[in-house]
Amino acid sequence: MGGCYSAYASSRKLRGRISKISLVIPDPVPDAEAASPRKDGVDGDGDDVRGGGGGCDDGGDVVAIATTTADEFARRYVLGKELGRGEFGVTRRCSDAATGEALACKTIRKHRRLAPPRVTAAKAAAAHGEDVKREVAIMRRMSSASSSRGGGAASSAAVVRLREACEDAADGSVHLVMELCEGGELFDRIVARGHYSERAAANIFRTIVDVVQLCHSNGVIHRDLKPENFLFANKSEDSPLKVIDFGLSVFFKPGDRFTEVVGSAYYMAPEVLRRSYGPEVDVWSAGVILYILLCGVPPFWGDNDEKIAQAILRGAIDFNREPLPRVSANAKDLVRRMLDPNPSTRLTAKQVLEHPWLKNADTAPNVSLGDAVRARLQQFSAMNKFKKKALGVVARNLPGEEVDKYVQMFHHMDKDKNGHLSLDELLEGLHINGQPVPEPEIRMLLEAADTDGNGTLDCDEFVTVSVHLKKMSNDEYLAAAFNYFDKDGSGFIELDELREEVGPNEQAILEILRDVDTDKDGRISYQEFELMMKSGADWRNASRHFSRANFSTLSRRLCKDTLTP
């Protein structure tokens, strides 16, 4: 799989063990609660934004979301084709019924939170409502801040504009209507332009850092900066680059520290894994993007999530990879200072913008970085598209929650009926249920899942971890994704089927085949597809619950010597 830098998979040893039991870590306890109008742990999803009046709220940095009806919403907006799908929602192209203006609509469906007996349905629904309110409040604040700026390197258009937000009175789903970005992804634009130089990278990167500075100056940590979250507004040569997704973002105040392990594997700062972080994590993630812009691959790479996390914690940056030896000293200095493992000495976003490499971006070397970098970026982008399609199918097929079964299992395993499962009760209960697991691994999982730190699991913790592991441990979802691509049912994903999903870019298709088609027969078998999905970062991170659980477990194991109790 050599060059497949965006693959999703897991440590086979850990995956094999975890798949035998019904445990994974639940959403962590909220942190820095006072800094946010809702709890830290947003589940809002719906992926990208690709491609006033009535019953909706428009603009304003408030958390109230007005209600509407399906008929009323349909009178105002015409929904079109699907643009992206996540675990809890879907993004579609839409248009203003009155003006015909092209827009995007991200619909976050009502997420039924796990509600064991002591948690009322009303309380669970309220928690979900707070989740969505935070995403809406952040988008409103950032839309307002961006539109009021004017001028500057990124001008006033660095953040996708939220037009309206409203909740369906019948099913509780929330519609976020926002501007449509049709200019394509960052890496696609770079590849299409042909000539790609350090100067071009500097001008692109200045916009990215300007977005980070805009977030931080408005009390927002993005927490999920990555190339896929930046789109061009339109196809014009001077189109603005916009950040599109605030689903994991949080409000913060100076001095706030967060503990929730969130983000995407390659872009995660070391202090996130250590469970104590602030806005500096966005600068780290932007530094990872800069490294990729300069050489086409991530600075911290591994065959699975654990190795990626280990590489991040080691912090060793390879400046010998072509073409980095030929890149200017200023560019490499900026990478080093943004990827400083110590957040207290890492540059701030404001300091990054004042760095000589960005202040003099227009005079940076205009010599091509070489075809190898463009090829790597093309490969990175093509594989992301292929993977994203597959993960969208997985998201569509995630099963409903089987809460009652796990509540009954909890009470059966709780021998002393004190409302908590001890290590001994877990070991005995798993053995009785035909799921014997070595004690050291049970200890590790218990520690990771025990959100209140009392050394046991209560019913809420047990049910949450059980349900989300069951969702993501079944490979039938991979089979469903494979069948989605295999339109003719031949048992192979063939060239025409790849073109239909990835687009007509022959070079991109060849890059996918080069990495995935291991027997070189010009098509992708299920075994090859499965191998692609199970190497690199864990494909199950498509579930934000699993992602939090996965990296929380890794952080506790890899950083146990530095974590505070």
Swiss-Prot record:
Chain positions recorded as Ca(2+) 4 binding sites: 517, 519, 521, 523, 528
Presence of keyword ATP-binding: yes
Domain of life, per lineage: Eukaryota
A GO molecular-function annotation: calcium ion binding
Region (Autoinhibitory domain): 364-394
Binding positions for Ca(2+) 1 per the UniProt entry: 414, 416, 418, 420, 425
SMART domains in UniProt: EFh (SM00054), S_TKc (SM00220)
Cellular component aspect of the GO annotation: cytoplasm; nucleus; plasma membrane
Note: Plants over-expressing CPK21 display enhanced tolerance to salt stress.
Protein name: Calcium-dependent protein kinase 21
Organism, scientific name: Oryza sativa subsp. japonica (Rice)
